[in-house]
Amino acid sequence: MTRFDNLQQFINTHLNAKLHTLNAITGDASFRRYYRLSHDNKHLIVMDSDPKKVNNEPYISLNQVFVEQGFLLPTIIASDEKQGFFVLSDLGSTHLADMLDDANRTEHYQALISLSAQWAKTPAASAMQAYNEDFIKVELDIFSQWLVSDFINEPLSAEQKIMWQTSSELLIQAMLEQPTVTVHRDYHSRNIMNSNGQWAIIDYQDAVRGPLCYDLVSLLRDCYFKLPQEELTSLLYFAYQEFTDQNLLVNTSFDEFKYWFDLTGLQRHLKAAGIFCRLYLRDGKTGYLDNILPTLDYIAEVAANYSELKALSEWTKNTIVPKVTEKLAKERS
């Protein structure tokens, strides 16, 4: 029997749903596959998450953690953990990404900033790793390995190696000096849903204990959508006040908060650009190629605002972006 046959058998056994239809849903960047199941005029989500490829334990344990804190997540209705099959509640198909042209977009973002503050206050759980120095270094290596070395085959000069080392150390320091909170790690427009007027969170299984500004920069400097600068600045002030009111920030100036926000974003975008390349080179996923250049643009733009990171900005703008542009043109020809 194929894996799909086993999945069908699981559905028949656990839901008594021999008469059903399964429609594939565009998956995320992981090895998971999702289907919308229709049965007796009801809709459910079926997740195929092979335990040989994915550790499903955090998905299960953190679901309970966050639901107990009052967050709306997919409910796990049935599961076969040995095979990695799950039946989940259907939260609909409306993501924040589908609502970005709304006239009340700013209000959406303000509500989601407030929600992220509540998420941050979730107590630590055993499934949450510490977003420590080693963890951050591993993520930065994704950029240097998968984008710089493997995707564009760009050797680093001795001077560039020093620049990369000093820039990395600066980003690590900025992330580690922030308050440590519960971090979703992918809090962006494709992982936030609106279900019957209520905000819902998906793809929560990689939650860690890490820097306060991480989820905020994931939301406001989204790899898939760029907010106008004026709107972003206004929302950043809103977030500063919200985090202060929630006692997540204590005796922190706005300038220091913005510095944390900017440098945390640089680390996230370096990692993300590398992951987009890895998804293509290792996993054969072409759907993220279009996101590489906008993500690199964030890096060049933000790093240029800090004298100690100007070399990173120039290298990104003058070396990395042209090489990536050339490589993308070749891959698409």
Which residues fall in each region the model found?
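Hydrophobic packing residues in well-ordered alpha-helices of helical domains and bundles
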Residues: 59, 105-112, 136, 164, ...
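Active-site activation/catalytic loop segments of kinase-like enzymes and analogous catalytic loops
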Residues: 144-151, 212-249, 263-283, 295-302
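Conserved NTP-binding catalytic cores of kinases and kinase-like/nucleotidyltransferase enzymes
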Residues: 1-85, 181, 196-200, 316-333
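Histidine/acidic-rich helix-loop-helix segments that form or flank divalent-metal centers
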Residues: 250-259
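ATP/Mg2+ or Mg2+-diphosphate-binding catalytic cores
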Residues: 274-333
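An alpha-helical support segment within catalytic cores of ATP-dependent transferases
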Residues: 7, 13-14, 124-129, 134-135, ...
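Active-site acidic catalytic loop and adjacent metal/ATP-binding pocket
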Residues: 31-37, 46, 119, 169-216, ...
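ATP-binding pocket architecture of kinase catalytic cores
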Residues: 32-138, 142, 152, 176
